[in-house]
Amino acid sequence: MTILTTLIKEDNHFQDLNQVFGQANTLVTGLSPSAKVTMIAEKYAQSNQQLLLITNNLYQADKLETDLLQFIDAEELYKYPVQDIMTEEFSTQSPQLMSERIRTLTALAQGKKGLFIVPLNGLKKWLTPVEMWQNHQMTLRVGEDIDVDQFLNKLVNMGYKRESVVSHIGEFSLRGGIIDIFPLIGEPIRIELFDTEIDSIRDFDVETQRSKDNVEEVDITTASDYIITEEVISHLKEELKTAYENTRPKIDKSVRNDLKETYESFKLFESTYFDHQILRRLVAFMYETPSTIIEYFQKDAIIAVDEFNRIKETEESLTVESDSFISNIIESGNGFIGQSFIKYDDFETLIEGYPVTYFSLFATTMPIKLNHIIKFSCKPVQQFYGQYDIMRSEFQRYVNQNYHIVVLVETETKVERMQAMLSEMHIPSITKLHRSMSSGQAVIIEGSLSEGFELPDMGLVVITERELFKSKQKKQRKRTKAISNAEKIKSYQDLNVGDYIVHVHHGVGRYLGVETLEVGQTHRDYIKLQYKGTDQLFVPVDQMDQVQKYVASEDKTPKLNKLGGSEWKKTKAKVQQSVEDIAEELIDLYKEREMAEGYQYGEDTAEQTTFELDFPYELTPDQAKSIDEIKDDMQKSRPMDRLLCGDVGYGKTEVAVRAAFKAVMEGKQVAFLVPTTILAQQHYETLIERMQDFPVEIQLMSRFRTPKEIKQTKEGLKTGFVDIVVGTHKLLSKDIQYKDLGLLIVDEEQRFGVRHKERIKTLKHNVDVLTLTATPIPRTLHMSMLGVRDLSVIETPPENRFPVQTYVLEQNMSFIKEALERELSRDGQVFYLYNKVQSIYEKREQLQMLMPDANIAVAHGQMTERDLEETMLSFINNEYDILVTTTIIETGVDVPNANTLIIEDADRFGLSQLYQLRGRVGRSSRIGYAYFLHPANKVLTETAEDRLQAIKEFTELGSGFKIAMRDLNIRGAGNLLGKQQHGFIDTVGFDLYSQMLEEAVNEKRGIKEPESEVPEVEVDLNLDAYLPTEYIANEQAKIEIYKKLRKTETFDQIIDIKDELIDRFNDYPVEVARLLDIVEIKVHALHSGITLIKDKGKIIDIHLSVKATENIDGEVLFKATQPLGRTMKVGVQNNAMTITLTKQNQWLDSLKFLVKCIEESMRISDEA
C-alpha cells in the first residue's frame, strides 16, 4: 500500500493538513471513511507521538481498524474495545476483548508509540489509577532475585487465580521451585527458581505441560483490566458499606432483602480470593481517584475525532441509558446509589488541553473554537459489480483525465486476472512498482479497503473488489491465541474425583481418587473406586488401563454395579450381541462397496479451475483437504460414500458445490437432498449465485414451486436438460427419473425418516454419495467402521468469524431491553429462545411492550409445517426483527443477519444444545452476542451450576466446549449406528462400546488382534515406589504420569519421562527414583523375554519364557554376570530358565545390572 501513501504525501492538500494536524483545533471535511484512514495513517507514519482516534462506538472502531491494518503494522495498532451496553459490566467478560484492553493499557502505561482506537464508551470508562497500573507491570529476567511471596501476591492483585496445574488463561501455580503462569497475552511461562534467584524462564505447552524454548526475559501482563490490592479491598469495604446504608432506606421495602443479598454476594468480608469478574461491577467504589484512559496517554499525544456529531448523539443516549440502567438496578435491589461505570463529564472536557483534529464527511457547525478548516473533495467510486461495459468506460475516463488509478485485490491470483481483464479493455496497467508511478495508468496491488474513493483534486482513484465484484472486504485479523483441537477435546477424558468410571471386569463405579496404601511394609498408589452400597475396589495404578471414564449422553446418570454380582456380565453380553450384529451389517456393506462399479471421473478441467478461483474467500486448510479427498474418491471407479462433518457455517456447502460442479462438467447430473424446504431454498440460492457465470441448469423441487414447475423439472431431469436439482424428500419419489445421475449430496441424513433413508440406500448403489452433517462424528468410532464410509472433517472456522461474545446473566428486563436495542440499532435481528410453548405468545406480548416498534414473530414445533416455514422464511428475508422461538432453531437454518441470541432459563438446557444454539449467531463478519439468562435468586441445582460455569468458559472455547463435544460425539454415534445403539452406549459407556465394536468388526473381517509383540511382564518388588502427593499434588497429573510409565517400552521414553518430571515438578524424591528404576527393569525384561520378576524377601526370582531360553547365549551371560558372583543362581523349570538373585546391600542396582546382562546375551534370531 506504499504507493497510496506516496501519492498522498506529495499532494498539497495533505501537506496543508499535515502542518496543523495535532497542532491546533482543526476541522477536516469531505473525506470518505477509507480516504480518511489513508490520511490518518500517513500522519501517524510521519510523527513520533501516540495518536488517539476516537469513534462513536465499537462497530465503527472495528471498521476503521480493518482499514488501518493495511497501512500500519499490527504491532503498533491498538484498540480499546468496550461494548456499547451496560449489561456487559454484570456478566462474564470475553477474554478476547479483555486481552485487547489490557494490551492497550499496558502499551500506554509503558509510553509506547502507537495508533490507539478508542470508542466513546471506552474514553469515559472508570479505570485503575495509572500509577497503580504502572506498578503492576512486571518484567522478569534470568539471574534476577525475586521475593516469591510478594510476587505471588502481585499475581493475585492482577487477577490471576492459583491452581495446582495451569490449564486456562489467567491461572498460576507453584510446585517446589517452579512457578507456572498463563498470561492473557503471550505464551504460558514456566519460571524455575534456585532459592530466590530466577534460574531459567521457559515457554511451555499447556496440553503436554512440557517446556519449549528458553527465554531471557518475559513481560507478565495483568489477567484482568482492574488491579485489586488489599488496600483497594479495604477502601471498597468502607465505600460499599456506606453505599448500602445510603441505598437501603431509599428503596421499596419489598426489595430490601434483595439488596442485602446483593451486598453479601460480593463476599468482601469472608473471602480471601476475590473474583475480578464480579468485583468490576463496583469500580465506582474501588479507588480513591480512579483514572480514565486519557490519563494514560502522553501529554503530547495527537487526537483525532471521527464524526463529532455522531459522537455527541451517542454520548446523549449513553448518559440516558446509563442513568436508567443504574436506577433500574437500584430499584430492583441489584445495585447501590453512587454505582456507575463511566465518568459523566462531557466528552470535550475529557480531551481538554489537547489540540484536536475533527473529521466530518459534511461541513457542520460545532460548539468548538476552530483554528483551521480544511475541505477535501472526495467522490465515491461507481459500483461496477462485474458489468464489463460500465467498467471499461469508467477506467477509460480515468486514463483520459490522467488519473493515478490504484486497484486493490485480495490475492496474487486475482492480481493476474485483473491485469488480463484490463489489457482486454486496452487500459495500461502494471503490477510491480519501480520507484514512482506515472499518471494515466493503473497499478494493481494486493490489499483491501472497505470501499474505494476518488480524490479529483489529487488526480487519484482507488478501486476495491467491493466496487469491482461486490465482494465483501475480508477481515484482517490480528493474531490471536489459537486453541488446538487436541486441547479442546482431550480433557473430557480427564478423571475428576466423583466421576463415573467403567472397569472392564467390574462395571460402572465412581472414581474417588488416588490413594497411597501400605501393603506388607511397602507403599504403593492405588485408584480407589466406589461401587454399589459400601463396596470399594482398589486398583493398582499399573492396571489402570482397565479403568475408563464413563462417557455417555449428557445428564445420563448411570447405575452403579455391585462388586462380584452377575449383573455386569449380563449387560456386557447383551451389548456384545448387538455389537456383533452391527459388525455383521458393516462387513456386508463393506463387501458390497468393494464390489460396486461406479463412474470414474477425470482430472479437473480448465472450467473447474476458473470456477474455483471465483470463490471470494480463502479456503481453510480443512476445506482444501476435504475437497482433495472428495475429488480423489470421484476419480476412482469405486462409488464414493463420504461423510463430510463440520460445524454450522464452517464452509461445508462450498466443498459440496465444487464436487457438484465437477460432476456437471463431465455431463453427469447432481441431486442435492435436504431435510427442509427452507434449507432447499438457501442451498438453491447459493448454487445459483456461485454458478451464474457458467452454463449450468439448476432447478428446485419443494413446496415453494408450482405443480407446473415441478413437472417441467421432472421432464428436465429425464431428458438431461437439468444438471443440478435441489430438493426435499420429493427428490426421492419413485416417479423421478434421472438421465444420468452421477452425484447425490445429502444434507443432515439423520433428519430423514426410515422410509426415506431406505430410498437413499437404493440410490447409493453405483452413484457417488456425499453426506454433510454438523453433528461431529467421533473419530474412535469412525476408526472401527473404516472402509464402510470415508470421513472428512472441517474443524477450523472461516477466517473472518469472530468468536461469539457470550454473557451469563441473571434474568432482568432492563438487560434484555438493552440487548434487543443494541442489535436492532445496528439493523440486525434477534433470536429470543423461550422453550415453553404454552406461554410463548404471552412472552411475545411482553417483549412487544418492551420494544413497541419491533416486528416480532413466533416459531414453535406445534405449528403446522407450512406456517412454520412461512414464518422462518419471512424472518430470513428480514421482515421480522425478533423471532421468539423454541429449540426448533437448533439445526440447519442460516440467518446471517441475526447476530444476537437470548436464551431464557439457560440453566435448563444441555451443554451441547447451548453450544449448537450459540452457533446460530456470529455467522457473518459481524460479532455475534449470546445471552444465557438464569432466574434471579433461584437456587440452581449442582448440574445447572456446573453447566453455567462451563458456559462461562465457552467464551474461550474452554472445557464447556469439550463437554459439548463429548455429548455431540455421542449424538453423532447414535446417528451413525441408529437409535437402539444409543441406549447400549449409555449402559457401558462410549469408550468401552467403541472398543467392543472395533474388536467385533476386526474379528468378522478375520483380522486378528495383533498379539502383543512383547508378552506382559510382572515385576513385583518390595519397594516404596510411587508418586508422593508432596511431589505431585494434582491427581490428574499423577494419573497422566502413571499412564505414561505403564506404556513405556523403550529407554528413550524413560529419559523423556525423567525430563518431564524435572521440567514440571523439579527434582524427584527417592520414591519416584525407585519407580523409574522399576520401569527401567521392566523395559529390559520386555526386550529379553523375562515374564516374571518377584521379590520373595531374601531372594528375587526371575523367570524367562521358553522362547527366550532358546535364544539366550549362556556363555555370554555367565561372562557378563561374573561381578555378581555367588549371589546369582541359574536353574531350569519346564524347559524355561529361572534365575535367583540373593539380596544384598545394593540389590536394586544388582538387579538392574542382571536384567541388562540378560538382554545383551540374547542371540538375534534369524527370522528378524
From Swiss-Prot:
Enzyme Commission number(s): 3.6.4.-
Alphabetical keyword list: ATP-binding, Cytoplasm, DNA damage, DNA repair, DNA-binding, Helicase, Hydrolase, Nucleotide-binding
Binding positions (ATP): G646, D647, V648, G649, Y650, G651, K652, T653
Pfam families documented for this protein: CarD_TRCF_RID (PF02559), DEAD (PF00270), Helicase_C (PF00271), MFD_D3 (PF21132), TRCF (PF03461), UvrB_inter (PF17757)
Domain Helicase C-terminal: 808-969
A Gene Ontology molecular function term of the record: RNA polymerase core enzyme binding
GO CC terms, sorted: cytoplasm
UniProt xrefs under SMART domains: CarD_TRCF, DEXDc, HELICc, TRCF
Motif DEEQ box, residue numbers: 747-750
GO BP terms: regulation of DNA-templated transcription; transcription-coupled nucleotide-excision repair, DNA damage recognition
Subcellular location as annotated: Cytoplasm
PANTHER family xrefs: ATP-DEPENDENT DNA HELICASE HOMOLOG RECG, CHLOROPLASTIC
Record protein name field: Transcription-repair-coupling factor
Organism: Staphylococcus aureus (strain NCTC 8325 / PS 47)
Organismal lineage: Bacteria, Bacillati, Bacillota, Bacilli, Bacillales
